[in-house]
């Protein structure tokens, strides 16, 4: 799923349709964008059939394969733009058996992920209400 980009493909049916049409109407679209448009067509059909993509899940996502969830799919870590297979594999290995109390703790444990990757995962909803840091406030 090289052309699968979670930022676009997991944004919902209307967002997928808009991005797909935007690329298709761009006569100067790059080969990468054209490949993404083809993937978006498949994603649009997926949504039309009543399925959905769950957010990338720091505990459940595989490195390179989609995971089946109730009525949908959980994308792999490689679906994050710019996140390569080796970083995805390392992340799955490093997170094994752990429970994280903050984004900071996850980031320190999964050290192959850049700040940009962490920010993208945050924007995609992968941390589901998890606090940014492990610090607690005694007087706040």
What are these regions (language model features)?
Residues 1-140:
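Noncatalytic, beta-rich nucleic-acid-contacting surfaces in large DNA/RNA-processing enzymes
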